[in-house]
Amino acid sequence: MPRPDSPRTDWRPSRRDFLQASTVAAGGVLAGGLSLARSAHAAGSDVLKIGAIGCGGRGTGAIADAMNADKNSKLVAMADAFEDRLQGALKRIKTAFPDRVAVDQDHCFTGFDGYKKVLASGVDVVILAEPPHFRPMHLKAAVEAGKHVFCEKPVAVDGPGVRSVLASAELAQKKGLSIVSGLCWRYHHGTKATIERVLDGAIGDILVMQETYNTGMIGGRDRDPSLTEMQFQMRNWYCFAWLSGDHNVEQHIHSLDKSAWAMRDEPPLRAWGLGGRQVRTEQPRYGDIYDHHAVCYEYANGTRLYSFCRQHAGCWSDVTDTFIGTKGRARVLPSYEIEGQDKWKFKGEGGNMYVLEHEALFQSIRSGKPINNGVYMARSTMLAILGRMVNYTGQLLTWEQAINSQQDLSPKSYAWDANPPTMPDKDGKYPVAMPGVTKFV
């Protein structure tokens, strides 16, 4: 199956109507009754101006999905760290939507401060699809600027970042702004229907959940000697934990989020696990991230979530979600069914969840009923980060320890000649976390 965050190439207009209110409510917390008078755009039928921050494959796909979702929207500003990525995305979007792209070169911004210029360019809606490290910073700036936000997953790579996102989500609710998360399975009809039945008791009390995200190799690039260390790591962002969070955070969060949803977004008490780097050993190509993770999350009610993710070439792949309860079993991916006393199987169309999430966002803006996915997107991100923490350190850690972690993966400064937080040794090799040696901070 394609990765949930792989670039979208099908840019045909969606024929689906906007989500009904029940779908929107399940997709996030409705901040009903809040006035949009202080927000970026009044409800109605006016053109909504989109700004994009992060123009790689996911960013390009998200722009297309947004424009398919609302035919009265227009792309007016773009930012990316790299000029070639920005111009490539602009060319693709112009080809797909020739009459709805109003981005001149004066509204193409590059470098680490490009996001500020997008926010100052009169946009109503901002798409955040930059490397995950930057999302807390950019989300904070967007909300403070009064913009509605589509925020890709994950939303942070460390505890301070998660806490920042929670604060931004609270501010967005006070200001009547929408935040829609890129955790797209919450907007998939089959997933939503199945998990709603689980929440209604179709499998009884949940005893065990298993989330599996075992795929082939993703990411990795060879060093270009013309690049500074910061440029190389930014080009190869997926393979550096300070930028991506590691693959269990950047990818496996989609699976973990479904179990979080089934647990009503209540965090676990603690977690323990194991992980390592057996195949992804070529340096500097694969940076400092692991290639496999296994984590057990323990909840206060006795439920356990067993989480597995692996990126090895030439191996059996499996991306599935299974919940076992006192009355039956729920299979989300791939079959959307309940087995046991209350048998059921989803028969409808799943819908294009990549477009559906944007439909929900634009409908919320036009109706004056903002959506705020901020709490669950932050908690699901923290769930994944907790898994990385226990595997890197080899320790059992509580949720409270993790959410209050002081480990800040930010560099001292953002500049092309600055040192990233992870630097190679004299042989060009990066330090990799070692369980039992790496300390929890």
Per-segment meaning from a language model:
Residues G54-G59, Q173-G287, H293, Y297, ...:
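Predominantly a Rossmann-like dinucleotide-binding segment in NAD(P)-dependent oxidoreductases
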Residues P136-Y187, G201:
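Beta-strand-loop-alpha-helix segment that lines the small-molecule cofactor/substrate pocket
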